[in-house]
C-alpha cells in the first residue's frame, strides 16, 4: 500500500519518476492565463489569514462546501474568517475522490511546508496558527509566493476599459523580476446580446474618447485600447464563448444598422447577433495577428444557472456548469474566415465539455501553418476538466491526434496565489503518462528525447509561444 500523496504521488514507475524529478519538477512556471488581481501583485499584498488567501473567490471550494450542506453565510456571507475556515476544514474530509482533496494538501505543502498532516477538523487549529504566522512574513506575500513557486510569467485577465495602472507599476518596479502582463478580454464588446451592452459601450466611449455611432467608430475605440494593451506588454487575448457564433459578414452599412438598433434598445435577430459577433471577432483576430498576440477561446460554459444565487452573489460564484451545444461547424467557419487572408492569429482552443476533445484535437490540424510550431493549440483540461482524468484525456487525445511535443502546457486559470500547485499536479500526470508508454514499449526509453519533450511542455513551449 502506497503512502498518501508521498514523494512519488501519481508516479508509478521509475521512468515516470525520472522524468518528473530530473526534468519536470524544477522547471519554472509560465502561467499564461490566470485571474489574479494585478493590484494585489503591484501592492505586494500580505494576507491576514488563511481564509483570505485560500477561500476568498475560490468557487471550486464554495461548490464543495454547498454540497456538504453548509449555509451560504459561512461560504460567501458575513461569518467570521475563522468560521469560514472551520467550515472548510469540515468539508475537506468529505472531498475524497474529488481533486480538491489533492489540491488542498498540495496547497498546504507548497508554499507552507505542511507535509505530514491531513487537513480536517482535528488539525485545523494548528494549521491555522502555523500558516497565519507564515503569512505575515515577506516570503508569503503575493510576490513572495510567486517567487517561491518559481513563477516567471503571469498573464492576468483584463477588460479593454481597464487602465492597466497596476501592470505599469509592476513593470516599472526593478525590484520585482516576474513579468506580469495583461490579457485582453473583450467579451462585453463582442456579446451584443448582453443586457449591459449599451452601458458598457458608454464606458468604452469615455476611456477611448470616441463617439461610438458606427461599427467603424467601435473599431476605432477598440483600436485605441488595443494599442494601450500592447504598450503594456499584452501577449494574449481571451474570449469566453458560451456559444460559437458565425454568419457571413455583411457590409459596413448593415453592421452600422445592427449597432444602431441595439444602441436604441431594439431587439436583434439571431442572424444579426451572429453577423455582428463574426465581424468583430474576425477584425479582432486580424489585429491580434498584427501584434503577434495569441487568441485564446474558452468554449462551452453554461453560466449563471441559479437565478436566485446570481441575484444574490453575481457571476463567477460557483453556479456554472458544462453546456452541450455543438459548435464544430461555426468554429471551423470562423477560423477559416480569419485564415483566408492569412490573418488567423496563434490560437488556443479550450472546450469545457470533454465530449468535444477529439473534435478540437482534429480541428487544430486544419489551420497549422509553417513558421510557428503548434500555432493552433488544443488547450489544457479546463475548469471542470483540470483534474486527473480530464488532464489525462486531453493529453492522450492531443498526442493521438496532434503533436503532444508542441503543447504549451498547463495554466492555473485561477484567482488564488496558492493555485500554482496545479502545475505540479499536471507535471506529475504528464510524466506518469509518458512513463507508462515506455514501460509498455510504446515509446523508447530515451531520457534525452523524452526529458526534453517534458521540459518543453512544462515551460519552454509556452515561453516561445507567448514571446
Swiss-Prot record:
Pathway: Carbohydrate metabolism; pentose and glucuronate interconversion. InterPro entries: Metal_Hydrolase, Uronate_isomerase. It comes from Actinobacillus succinogenes (strain ATCC 55618 / DSM 22257 / CCUG 43843 / 130Z). It is an enzyme of class 5 (isomerase). Keywords: Isomerase. Coiled coil: none annotated. This is Uronate isomerase. One of its GO terms (biological process) is D-galacturonate catabolic process. Its EC number is 5.3.1.12. Disulfide bonds: none annotated. SUPFAM superfamilies: Metallo-dependent hydrolases. Belongs to the metallo-dependent hydrolases superfamily. Uronate isomerase family. It catalyses: D-glucuronate = D-fructuronate; aldehydo-D-galacturonate = keto-D-tagaturonate. One of its GO terms (molecular function) is glucuronate isomerase activity. It holds the Pfam family UxaC.
